[in-house]
Regions:
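Basic nucleic-acid-binding interfaces
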Residues: 1-158
Length: 158
């Protein structure tokens, strides 16, 4: 263990690191452009307020990956409830037009993925860094060219 990975409180020494993934409601491709910048700023600000360190993060169009260190006074579910709840309100304040897509002011889908980080921290950091590029490649692979049976010409949509 490296010293910088270990946190200290008055009577506690700790290293509580988690890989967390969560997505917008309906897994919509909503995190791009100005919204992506705002989501990043909002999540950084909220984490800072709770003393949560963001070690690595990536915002893909349809989900967020975060490698974070949470102080032991908070549970993962407390932090996720706080991040998703507060960030939803802040996102809707900055982007009022989203209320037409997400009428109930819930920007994030219910639930999230969480995994503890142990000795595989470097692999998880690399995985998070590569996610955006892998998503782009997967999107390009999934683009199908359809041939019109009557004309024989290629169509890009079904």
């Amino acid at each position: 263990m490296k010293e910088k990975d270990i946190g200290n409180l008055q009577h506690t020494t700790w290293r509580c690191q988690y890989h967390i993934v969560f997505a917008p409601k309906y897994r919509r491709l909503a995190i791009y452009g100005q919204i992506k910048k705002d989501v990043g700023q909002i999540l950084r600000k909220l984490c800072e307020q709770k003393g949560v360190e963001i070690i690595e993060a990536e915002a893909c169009p349809d989900h967020i990956h975060m490698l974070i260190s949470i102080p032991p006074k908070y549970s993962v579910s407390q932090i996720m409830g706080y991040l998703k709840g507060k960030s939803s309100l802040m996102i809707f304040d900055r982007h009022a037009n989203l209320k037409y897509k997400y009428g109930d002011r819930h920007f994030w889908a219910r639930g999230y993925y969480v995994d503890t980080v142990g000795r595989n921290k470097k692999q998880i950091q690399e995985y998070i860094r590569s996610q955006l590029e892998e998503d782009k490649i997967a999107d390009q692979i999934s683009i199908k060219e359809f041939i019109d049976p009557f004309t024989g010409s290629k169509n890009s949509k079904a």
